Design a protein with these regions (language model features):
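DNA polymerase processivity clamps
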Residues: 1-48, 63-177
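Glycine-rich, pocket-lining loop/helix-strand segments that form or immediately flank
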Residues: 51
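Bateman (tandem CBS) regulatory domains
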Residues: 58-62
Length: 177
């Protein structure tokens, strides 16, 4: 009781696949491992040593720039723009009062551009993100809309659902020239 442990995300992802339809989960904590039993399935994983990083210090206290966009439209647009982008190519989000432009520029290939309807409050801003990390956050977000809150192009952005206040995804931008 009162014990705090760090469980690898891969183990938790595997566990969620087994939990469908299970009424009871048993957790057993060892000094260096944790076992989860659900029905006739047991998953054992090594625990991560150390303390969870103090992420609260990274969360900006004010967010002068707020973008609200359809979750499905953003997912589809990011996937289309990402098709042209190479593995390390960031996707730029250009946020204006006219909406949202997604842009990926890849040397030798060209650029992909997608315009989306969005509501934006704040100063015009372009922020670049690793498209895989941005997609991962949006894919697990519940609700029909995505709210992206930013301070500037270099500070962490918050990705949230306006309908589900308990979800928060902290995303670091990528520096682009």
């Amino acid at each position: 009781e009162g014990q705090s442990v760090l469980v690898p995300s891969r183990a938790l992802n595997d566990l969620t696949k087994v939990l469908a339809g299970v009424d009871q989960l048993t957790l057993r904590l060892g000094e260096r491992d944790a076992s989860f039993e659900a029905g006739d399935v047991r998953l054992t994983t090594m625990l991560i040593e150390g303390e969870f990083p103090n992420y609260k210090g990274l969360i900006p206290t004010s967010h002068p720039n707020r973008l609200t966009v359809s979750r499905e439209a953003l997912l589809e647009g990011l996937r289309r723009v990402k098709l042209l982008a190479r593995e390390a190519t960031p996707v730029r989000l250009a946020m204006t009062s006219d909406g949202l432009d997604l842009v990926a520029v890849t040397q030798d290939v060209g650029q992909a551009h997608e315009s989306l309807d969005a509501k934006y409050e704040g100063t015009e801003l372009t922020v670049a993100f690793n498209p895989d990390y941005l997609l991962q956050g949006i894919e697990v977000l519940a609700g029909d809309e995505v709210l992206i809150e930013t301070v500037d192009a270099l500070k962490p952005a918050l990705v949230r659902s306006p309908e589900h206040a308990d979800f928060l995804y902290l995303l670091m931008p990528v520096r682009v020239s």
